[in-house]
């Protein structure tokens, strides 16, 4: 039994293909982007202090090959951002992250990136932009998935804010578009304890 007429099936197929292709936006790679990201909508989850789960024990190397772990920032609020130099929304939010990182550097707040896929491109991007915080080199995509037990990632970029007790307090999906939103979430976490 044919539920949809042939013409309706054709229209539906074209619409689905258009939707899929628009979600993979990007370029030919000449500008350093490759698409293949899923950007969030700026929605976020704030976990009440008693309900927070332990942050994963991320440990590895930064983009320069130096040892890096979340443990070295124990006692600080840590802002962890999953990004890629190939991701246009990630590139767009970098000035916001860097500005707030510089502003709060003396307030027991540490920023850390998780650079996915193209580590060489990420290293060049961080150097060119003078990003003031380290990023884990994550060619294999193994770091972000470690947040699955608390608040899993569903987009690139995704940002988590870990409280000073090492618990995941916030997950923000998509790029930050204002310093005040990021700063406000950090201040909320600073004012709460798990």
Task: Go through each PLM region and give its residues.
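N-terminal post-signal-peptidase region of extra-cytosolic proteins
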Residues: 43-44, 68, 144-147
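Thiol/disulfide oxidoreductase modules built on the thioredoxin-like
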Residues: 127-132, 139-191
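Structural microenvironment flanking redox-active thiols in thiol-disulfide oxidoreductases
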Residues: 91-130, 140-146
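N-terminal targeting signals for export/organelle localization
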Residues: 1-59, 184, 191-194
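A short beta-strand-turn-helix
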Residues: 48-78
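Active-site-proximal beta-strand/loop segments in catalytic clefts of secreted hydrolases
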Residues: 82-84, 114-117, 138-139, 175
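Short active-site neighborhood of thiol/selenol oxidoreductases, capturing the structured segment around
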Residues: 68-91, 97
């Amino acid at each position: 039994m044919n539920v949809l007429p042939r013409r309706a099936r054709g229209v539906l197929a074209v619409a689905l293909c258009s939707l899929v292709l628009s979600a993979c936006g990007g370029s030919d790679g000449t500008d350093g982007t490759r698409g293949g990201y899923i950007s969030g909508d700026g929605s976020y989850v704030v976990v009440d202090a008693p309900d927070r789960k332990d942050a994963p024990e991320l440990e590895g190397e930064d983009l320069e090959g130096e040892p890096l772990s979340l443990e070295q920032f124990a006692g600080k609020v840590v802002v962890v951002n999953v990004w890629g130099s190939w991701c246009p929304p990630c590139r767009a939010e970098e000035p916001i992250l860097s500005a707030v990182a510089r502003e709060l550097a003396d307030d027991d707040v540490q920023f850390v990136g998780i650079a996915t896929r193209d580590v060489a491109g990420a290293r060049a991007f961080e150097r060119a932009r003078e990003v003031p915080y380290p990023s884990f080199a994550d060619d294999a995509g193994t770091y972000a998935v470690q947040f699955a037990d608390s608040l899993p990632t569903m987009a690139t970029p995704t940002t988590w804010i870990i409280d000073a007790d090492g618990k995941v307090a916030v997950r923000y999906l998509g790029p930050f578009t204002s310093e005040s939103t990021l700063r406000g979430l950090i201040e909320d976490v600073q004012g709460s304890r798990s």
